[in-house]
Amino acid sequence: MLSEALLVSAPGKVILHGEHAVVHGKVALAAALNLRTFLLLRPQSNGKVSVNLPNIGIKQVWDVGMLQRLDTSFLEQGDVSVPTLEQLEKLKKMGDLPRDRAGNEGMALLAFLYLYLAICRKQRTLPSLDMVVWSELPPGAGLGSSAAYSVCLAAALLTACEEVSNPLKDGVSVSRWPEEDLKSINKWAFEGERVIHGNPSGVDNAVSTWGGALRFQQGTMSSLKSLPSLQILLTNTKVPRSTKALVAAVRSRLTKFPEIVAPLLTSIDAISLECERVLGEMVAAPVPEQYLVLEELIDMNQHHLNALGVGHNSLDQLCQVTAAHGLHSKLTGAGGGGCGITLLKPGLEQATVEAAKQALTSCGFDCWETSIGAPGVSTHSAAAVGDPVRQALGL
Protein backbone atom coordinates (compact mmCIF):
# COMPACT_ATOMS: atom_id res chain seq x y z
CA MET A 1 0.00 0.00 0.00
CA LEU A 2 1.10 3.61 -0.53
CA SER A 3 3.72 4.59 2.04
CA GLU A 4 4.90 7.94 0.64
CA ALA A 5 3.58 10.76 -1.53
CA LEU A 6 2.95 9.97 -5.20
CA LEU A 7 2.98 12.72 -7.86
CA VAL A 8 1.59 11.98 -11.33
CA SER A 9 0.68 14.06 -14.37
CA ALA A 10 -1.11 13.55 -17.68
CA PRO A 11 -1.43 15.78 -20.77
CA GLY A 12 -4.42 17.30 -22.51
CA LYS A 13 -5.01 16.91 -26.24
CA VAL A 14 -5.71 18.80 -29.44
CA ILE A 15 -7.17 17.51 -32.69
CA LEU A 16 -4.74 18.39 -35.48
CA HIS A 17 -7.01 17.38 -38.36
CA GLY A 18 -10.16 15.34 -38.90
CA GLU A 19 -12.62 16.81 -36.41
CA HIS A 20 -16.21 16.15 -37.52
CA ALA A 21 -15.02 14.03 -40.48
CA VAL A 22 -14.07 11.32 -37.96
CA VAL A 23 -17.76 10.95 -37.03
CA HIS A 24 -18.35 9.84 -40.64
CA GLY A 25 -15.61 7.21 -40.78
CA LYS A 26 -12.69 9.42 -41.79
CA VAL A 27 -9.23 9.69 -40.18
CA ALA A 28 -8.56 12.07 -37.29
CA LEU A 29 -5.15 12.95 -35.86
CA ALA A 30 -4.97 13.82 -32.16
CA ALA A 31 -1.84 14.95 -30.33
CA ALA A 32 -0.92 15.26 -26.66
CA LEU A 33 -0.73 18.86 -25.53
CA ASN A 34 2.07 19.98 -23.23
CA LEU A 35 -0.39 21.48 -20.78
CA ARG A 36 -0.87 18.97 -17.99
CA THR A 37 -2.99 17.94 -15.03
CA PHE A 38 -1.05 17.11 -11.85
CA LEU A 39 -2.23 14.87 -9.02
CA LEU A 40 -0.57 14.51 -5.62
CA LEU A 41 -1.63 11.51 -3.53
CA ARG A 42 -0.50 11.24 0.09
CA PRO A 43 -1.19 8.42 2.57
CA GLN A 44 -3.03 9.49 5.74
CA SER A 45 -3.57 7.86 9.13
CA ASN A 46 -6.64 9.84 10.18
CA GLY A 47 -9.26 7.50 8.72
CA LYS A 48 -10.31 10.06 6.12
CA VAL A 49 -10.29 10.32 2.33
CA SER A 50 -9.98 13.93 1.20
CA VAL A 51 -10.18 15.34 -2.32
CA ASN A 52 -9.11 18.91 -3.12
CA LEU A 53 -9.64 20.36 -6.62
CA PRO A 54 -8.53 24.01 -6.29
CA ASN A 55 -9.13 24.85 -9.98
CA ILE A 56 -12.87 24.44 -9.51
CA GLY A 57 -13.13 25.22 -5.80
CA ILE A 58 -14.01 21.73 -4.55
CA LYS A 59 -12.96 20.12 -1.30
CA GLN A 60 -14.66 16.94 -0.09
CA VAL A 61 -13.86 14.66 2.85
CA TRP A 62 -15.24 11.17 3.46
CA ASP A 63 -14.85 8.90 6.47
CA VAL A 64 -13.14 5.65 5.43
CA GLY A 65 -15.41 3.67 7.76
CA MET A 66 -18.49 5.06 6.01
CA LEU A 67 -17.04 4.22 2.58
CA GLN A 68 -16.12 0.74 3.83
CA ARG A 69 -19.76 0.09 4.70
CA LEU A 70 -21.10 1.10 1.27
CA ASP A 71 -22.78 -1.61 -0.77
CA THR A 72 -20.37 -1.94 -3.68
CA SER A 73 -21.56 -5.35 -4.82
CA PHE A 74 -21.98 -3.97 -8.34
CA LEU A 75 -18.19 -3.66 -8.55
CA GLU A 76 -17.20 -7.10 -9.79
CA GLN A 77 -13.99 -8.41 -8.27
CA GLY A 78 -11.02 -8.32 -10.59
CA ASP A 79 -12.60 -6.72 -13.65
CA VAL A 80 -12.82 -3.23 -15.04
CA SER A 81 -16.52 -2.71 -14.44
CA VAL A 82 -18.82 -0.56 -16.56
CA PRO A 83 -20.96 1.73 -14.41
CA THR A 84 -24.67 2.04 -15.18
CA LEU A 85 -26.68 5.22 -14.62
CA GLU A 86 -28.61 3.51 -11.82
CA GLN A 87 -25.38 2.49 -10.09
CA LEU A 88 -23.97 6.00 -10.36
CA GLU A 89 -27.15 7.52 -8.93
CA LYS A 90 -26.93 5.03 -6.07
CA LEU A 91 -23.27 5.92 -5.52
CA LYS A 92 -24.13 9.64 -5.44
CA LYS A 93 -26.58 9.03 -2.61
CA MET A 94 -24.40 6.52 -0.74
CA GLY A 95 -21.33 8.73 -1.08
CA ASP A 96 -23.21 11.72 0.35
CA LEU A 97 -22.13 13.98 -2.52
CA PRO A 98 -23.23 17.59 -1.95
CA ARG A 99 -26.43 18.37 -3.82
CA ASP A 100 -25.16 21.81 -4.80
CA ARG A 101 -22.36 20.15 -6.79
CA ALA A 102 -23.94 19.88 -10.21
CA GLY A 103 -22.48 19.35 -13.66
CA ASN A 104 -18.79 18.67 -14.13
CA GLU A 105 -17.92 19.54 -10.52
CA GLY A 106 -20.14 16.79 -9.15
CA MET A 107 -19.00 14.42 -11.89
CA ALA A 108 -15.34 14.96 -10.91
CA LEU A 109 -16.11 13.86 -7.35
CA LEU A 110 -18.24 10.96 -8.54
CA ALA A 111 -15.47 9.76 -10.90
CA PHE A 112 -13.01 9.77 -8.00
CA LEU A 113 -15.39 7.91 -5.70
CA TYR A 114 -16.18 5.32 -8.36
CA LEU A 115 -12.52 4.65 -9.24
CA TYR A 116 -11.42 4.70 -5.58
CA LEU A 117 -13.98 2.06 -4.60
CA ALA A 118 -13.53 -0.02 -7.77
CA ILE A 119 -9.72 -0.08 -7.71
CA CYS A 120 -9.14 -0.22 -3.94
CA ARG A 121 -11.87 -2.78 -3.17
CA LYS A 122 -9.35 -5.66 -3.05
CA GLN A 123 -7.64 -4.08 -0.02
CA ARG A 124 -8.66 -5.54 3.34
CA THR A 125 -9.47 -2.01 4.45
CA LEU A 126 -9.88 0.97 2.16
CA PRO A 127 -6.85 3.29 2.29
CA SER A 128 -6.91 6.68 3.99
CA LEU A 129 -5.69 9.16 1.37
CA ASP A 130 -5.31 12.88 0.72
CA MET A 131 -5.55 13.89 -2.96
CA VAL A 132 -4.92 17.29 -4.53
CA VAL A 133 -5.40 17.83 -8.28
CA TRP A 134 -4.34 20.96 -10.14
CA SER A 135 -4.47 21.53 -13.89
CA GLU A 136 -2.93 23.83 -16.47
CA LEU A 137 -5.85 22.91 -18.77
CA PRO A 138 -8.97 25.09 -18.88
CA PRO A 139 -12.07 22.94 -18.23
CA GLY A 140 -14.78 22.59 -20.86
CA ALA A 141 -12.60 23.86 -23.72
CA GLY A 142 -12.35 20.59 -25.67
CA LEU A 143 -8.74 20.03 -24.60
CA GLY A 144 -9.27 16.71 -22.81
CA SER A 145 -9.16 18.10 -19.26
CA SER A 146 -11.54 15.46 -17.89
CA ALA A 147 -9.56 12.66 -19.57
CA ALA A 148 -6.29 13.96 -18.10
CA TYR A 149 -8.01 13.97 -14.69
CA SER A 150 -9.31 10.42 -15.16
CA VAL A 151 -5.89 9.17 -16.32
CA CYS A 152 -4.20 10.75 -13.29
CA LEU A 153 -6.81 9.19 -10.98
CA ALA A 154 -6.39 5.74 -12.52
CA ALA A 155 -2.59 5.86 -12.50
CA ALA A 156 -2.37 7.12 -8.91
CA LEU A 157 -4.94 4.71 -7.44
CA LEU A 158 -3.62 1.66 -9.32
CA THR A 159 -0.09 2.50 -8.14
CA ALA A 160 -1.22 3.17 -4.56
CA CYS A 161 -2.98 -0.22 -4.43
CA GLU A 162 0.00 -1.95 -6.10
CA GLU A 163 -2.10 -3.05 -9.07
CA VAL A 164 0.69 -1.50 -11.17
CA SER A 165 4.25 -0.89 -10.01
CA ASN A 166 5.65 2.55 -9.22
CA PRO A 167 8.18 3.14 -12.02
CA LEU A 168 9.91 6.07 -10.26
CA LYS A 169 13.23 4.94 -8.81
CA ASP A 170 15.54 6.80 -6.44
CA GLY A 171 17.54 9.51 -8.17
CA VAL A 172 15.17 9.64 -11.18
CA SER A 173 13.10 12.79 -11.69
CA VAL A 174 10.46 11.58 -14.20
CA SER A 175 9.38 8.08 -15.18
CA ARG A 176 6.66 6.32 -17.17
CA TRP A 177 4.87 3.00 -16.72
CA PRO A 178 5.57 -0.04 -18.97
CA GLU A 179 3.13 -0.85 -21.78
CA GLU A 180 1.05 -3.44 -19.90
CA ASP A 181 0.54 -1.05 -16.99
CA LEU A 182 -0.41 1.76 -19.40
CA LYS A 183 -3.11 -0.50 -20.86
CA SER A 184 -4.54 -1.04 -17.39
CA ILE A 185 -4.37 2.70 -16.61
CA ASN A 186 -6.13 3.49 -19.89
CA LYS A 187 -8.92 0.96 -19.25
CA TRP A 188 -9.70 2.41 -15.84
CA ALA A 189 -9.37 6.00 -17.10
CA PHE A 190 -11.96 5.18 -19.76
CA GLU A 191 -14.36 4.12 -16.99
CA GLY A 192 -13.71 7.45 -15.28
CA GLU A 193 -14.58 9.17 -18.57
CA ARG A 194 -17.77 7.10 -18.75
CA VAL A 195 -18.79 8.42 -15.36
CA ILE A 196 -18.20 12.02 -16.47
CA HIS A 197 -19.42 11.91 -20.08
CA GLY A 198 -21.59 8.80 -20.43
CA ASN A 199 -20.43 7.69 -23.87
CA PRO A 200 -16.87 8.90 -24.60
CA SER A 201 -14.94 7.89 -27.73
CA GLY A 202 -11.85 6.79 -25.81
CA VAL A 203 -9.58 9.06 -27.87
CA ASP A 204 -8.94 11.63 -25.14
CA ASN A 205 -7.92 9.15 -22.45
CA ALA A 206 -5.75 7.18 -24.92
CA VAL A 207 -3.85 10.33 -25.97
CA SER A 208 -3.43 11.32 -22.32
CA THR A 209 -2.19 7.83 -21.38
CA TRP A 210 0.31 7.24 -24.21
CA GLY A 211 1.13 10.81 -25.25
CA GLY A 212 2.63 11.63 -28.65
CA ALA A 213 -0.01 11.48 -31.37
CA LEU A 214 -2.74 9.02 -32.34
CA ARG A 215 -4.52 8.22 -35.57
CA PHE A 216 -8.19 7.42 -35.03
CA GLN A 217 -10.63 5.93 -37.54
CA GLN A 218 -13.89 4.03 -37.04
CA GLY A 219 -13.09 3.06 -33.47
CA THR A 220 -9.54 1.91 -34.26
CA MET A 221 -6.61 3.79 -32.75
CA SER A 222 -2.94 3.54 -33.65
CA SER A 223 0.02 5.53 -32.42
CA LEU A 224 2.00 7.67 -34.84
CA LYS A 225 5.40 6.02 -34.54
CA SER A 226 7.16 9.33 -33.95
CA LEU A 227 6.35 12.99 -34.07
CA PRO A 228 8.57 15.99 -34.71
CA SER A 229 8.62 18.64 -32.02
CA LEU A 230 5.99 21.20 -33.01
CA GLN A 231 5.45 24.50 -31.22
CA ILE A 232 1.97 25.96 -31.28
CA LEU A 233 0.00 28.87 -29.97
CA LEU A 234 -3.16 27.56 -28.33
CA THR A 235 -6.00 30.08 -28.10
CA ASN A 236 -9.22 29.72 -26.12
CA THR A 237 -11.92 32.03 -27.50
CA LYS A 238 -13.94 31.28 -24.34
CA VAL A 239 -17.07 31.03 -26.50
CA PRO A 240 -19.14 28.10 -25.16
CA ARG A 241 -20.51 25.54 -27.60
CA SER A 242 -22.37 22.25 -27.68
CA THR A 243 -20.40 19.46 -29.34
CA LYS A 244 -23.58 17.42 -29.66
CA ALA A 245 -25.42 20.24 -31.48
CA LEU A 246 -22.50 20.89 -33.85
CA VAL A 247 -22.15 17.19 -34.75
CA ALA A 248 -25.91 17.06 -35.42
CA ALA A 249 -25.70 20.17 -37.62
CA VAL A 250 -22.99 18.60 -39.81
CA ARG A 251 -25.02 15.41 -40.11
CA SER A 252 -28.06 17.47 -41.13
CA ARG A 253 -26.04 19.34 -43.76
CA LEU A 254 -24.71 16.04 -45.12
CA THR A 255 -28.27 14.71 -45.43
CA LYS A 256 -29.46 17.90 -47.11
CA PHE A 257 -26.51 18.31 -49.52
CA PRO A 258 -24.87 14.87 -49.84
CA GLU A 259 -23.09 15.59 -53.13
CA ILE A 260 -21.54 18.75 -51.66
CA VAL A 261 -20.76 17.70 -48.08
CA ALA A 262 -19.53 14.14 -48.72
CA PRO A 263 -16.65 15.42 -50.92
CA LEU A 264 -15.76 17.93 -48.19
CA LEU A 265 -15.43 15.08 -45.70
CA THR A 266 -13.35 13.08 -48.19
CA SER A 267 -11.11 16.10 -48.70
CA ILE A 268 -10.65 16.57 -44.94
CA ASP A 269 -9.66 12.90 -44.80
CA ALA A 270 -7.03 13.54 -47.47
CA ILE A 271 -5.73 16.51 -45.45
CA SER A 272 -5.33 14.28 -42.38
CA LEU A 273 -3.49 11.61 -44.39
CA GLU A 274 -1.19 14.18 -46.00
CA CYS A 275 -0.41 15.68 -42.60
CA GLU A 276 0.40 12.21 -41.25
CA ARG A 277 2.72 11.58 -44.20
CA VAL A 278 4.53 14.92 -43.83
CA LEU A 279 4.94 14.52 -40.06
CA GLY A 280 6.47 11.09 -40.66
CA GLU A 281 8.99 12.58 -43.09
CA MET A 282 9.86 15.41 -40.69
CA VAL A 283 11.03 13.16 -37.87
CA ALA A 284 14.47 12.50 -39.39
CA ALA A 285 15.39 16.00 -40.56
CA PRO A 286 12.66 18.62 -41.01
CA VAL A 287 13.13 21.18 -43.77
CA PRO A 288 11.43 24.60 -44.13
CA GLU A 289 9.29 23.44 -47.07
CA GLN A 290 7.55 20.88 -44.84
CA TYR A 291 6.40 23.57 -42.42
CA LEU A 292 4.96 25.46 -45.39
CA VAL A 293 2.96 22.33 -46.31
CA LEU A 294 1.67 22.05 -42.73
CA GLU A 295 0.57 25.70 -42.89
CA GLU A 296 -1.28 25.11 -46.17
CA LEU A 297 -3.03 22.08 -44.71
CA ILE A 298 -4.11 24.15 -41.70
CA ASP A 299 -5.58 26.85 -43.95
CA MET A 300 -7.39 24.37 -46.19
CA ASN A 301 -8.86 22.44 -43.28
CA GLN A 302 -10.13 25.62 -41.63
CA HIS A 303 -11.97 26.60 -44.83
CA HIS A 304 -13.46 23.10 -45.07
CA LEU A 305 -14.67 23.29 -41.47
CA ASN A 306 -16.29 26.65 -42.19
CA ALA A 307 -18.02 25.07 -45.19
CA LEU A 308 -19.35 22.34 -42.87
CA GLY A 309 -20.89 25.09 -40.73
CA VAL A 310 -18.83 24.64 -37.56
CA GLY A 311 -16.97 27.95 -37.71
CA HIS A 312 -17.69 31.00 -35.56
CA ASN A 313 -16.99 34.74 -35.66
CA SER A 314 -14.52 34.33 -32.79
CA LEU A 315 -12.57 31.70 -34.75
CA ASP A 316 -12.59 33.89 -37.87
CA GLN A 317 -11.18 36.69 -35.73
CA LEU A 318 -8.48 34.36 -34.36
CA CYS A 319 -7.46 33.35 -37.90
CA GLN A 320 -7.45 36.96 -39.13
CA VAL A 321 -5.40 38.26 -36.20
CA THR A 322 -2.75 35.55 -36.54
CA ALA A 323 -2.70 35.89 -40.36
CA ALA A 324 -1.87 39.58 -39.90
CA HIS A 325 1.34 38.36 -38.22
CA GLY A 326 2.08 35.80 -40.95
CA LEU A 327 0.76 32.85 -38.92
CA HIS A 328 -1.69 30.08 -39.83
CA SER A 329 -4.52 28.88 -37.57
CA LYS A 330 -7.49 26.52 -37.45
CA LEU A 331 -10.12 25.51 -34.94
CA THR A 332 -9.49 22.37 -32.94
CA GLY A 333 -12.26 20.15 -31.64
CA ALA A 334 -15.95 20.80 -32.12
CA GLY A 335 -15.70 24.39 -33.36
CA GLY A 336 -18.49 26.91 -32.86
CA GLY A 337 -16.10 28.79 -30.55
CA GLY A 338 -13.84 26.86 -28.22
CA CYS A 339 -10.15 26.67 -29.10
CA GLY A 340 -7.87 27.15 -32.07
CA ILE A 341 -4.26 26.21 -32.79
CA THR A 342 -1.61 28.27 -34.58
CA LEU A 343 1.60 26.70 -35.92
CA LEU A 344 4.82 28.37 -34.75
CA LYS A 345 7.52 27.23 -37.13
CA PRO A 346 11.23 27.26 -36.23
CA GLY A 347 13.05 30.53 -36.75
CA LEU A 348 10.01 32.64 -36.00
CA GLU A 349 10.98 35.81 -34.16
CA GLN A 350 9.71 35.88 -30.59
CA ALA A 351 8.59 39.47 -31.13
CA THR A 352 6.13 38.21 -33.77
CA VAL A 353 4.72 35.60 -31.39
CA GLU A 354 4.39 38.14 -28.58
CA ALA A 355 2.65 40.63 -30.88
CA ALA A 356 0.17 37.95 -31.98
CA LYS A 357 -0.46 36.90 -28.36
CA GLN A 358 -1.05 40.51 -27.34
CA ALA A 359 -3.49 41.05 -30.22
CA LEU A 360 -5.39 37.86 -29.34
CA THR A 361 -5.50 38.76 -25.65
CA SER A 362 -6.94 42.17 -26.56
CA CYS A 363 -9.78 40.26 -28.30
CA GLY A 364 -10.62 38.74 -24.91
CA PHE A 365 -9.02 35.38 -25.69
CA ASP A 366 -6.63 33.32 -23.54
CA CYS A 367 -3.34 32.19 -25.14
CA TRP A 368 -0.68 29.63 -24.32
CA GLU A 369 2.61 29.13 -26.12
CA THR A 370 3.13 25.38 -25.86
CA SER A 371 4.01 22.25 -27.83
CA ILE A 372 2.35 19.06 -29.04
CA GLY A 373 3.53 15.47 -28.93
CA ALA A 374 3.98 15.63 -25.14
CA PRO A 375 4.76 12.49 -23.11
CA GLY A 376 1.78 10.62 -21.70
CA VAL A 377 0.97 9.89 -18.07
CA SER A 378 4.11 10.15 -15.93
CA THR A 379 5.22 10.08 -12.33
CA HIS A 380 7.56 12.76 -11.00
CA SER A 381 9.77 13.61 -8.09
CA ALA A 382 8.67 16.84 -6.36
CA ALA A 383 11.81 18.58 -7.61
CA ALA A 384 10.96 17.77 -11.24
CA VAL A 385 7.93 20.07 -11.45
CA GLY A 386 7.86 23.86 -11.60
CA ASP A 387 7.20 26.25 -8.74
CA PRO A 388 3.58 27.03 -9.78
CA VAL A 389 2.73 23.31 -9.67
CA ARG A 390 4.45 22.76 -6.31
CA GLN A 391 2.70 25.80 -4.87
CA ALA A 392 -0.73 24.72 -6.16
CA LEU A 393 -0.28 21.20 -4.76
CA GLY A 394 1.11 22.39 -1.43
CA LEU A 395 4.52 20.77 -1.89
UniProtKB/Swiss-Prot annotation:
Organism: Mus musculus
UniProt keywords, alphabetically: ATP-binding, Cholesterol biosynthesis, Cholesterol metabolism, Cytoplasm, Kinase, Lipid biosynthesis, Lipid metabolism, Magnesium, Metal-binding, Nucleotide-binding, Peroxisome, Steroid biosynthesis, Steroid metabolism, Sterol biosynthesis, Sterol metabolism, Transferase
Domain of life per record: Eukaryota
Protein name: Mevalonate kinase
Gene3D superfamilies noted in UniProt: 3.30.230.10, GHMP kinase, C-terminal domain
Primary location recorded for the protein, binned into one broad class: cytoplasm
Encoding gene (name): Mvk
Complex formation: Homodimer.
Catalytic activity: (R)-mevalonate + ATP = (R)-5-phosphomevalonate + ADP + H(+)
Function in brief: Catalyzes the phosphorylation of mevalonate to mevalonate 5-phosphate, a key step in isoprenoid and cholesterol biosynthesis.
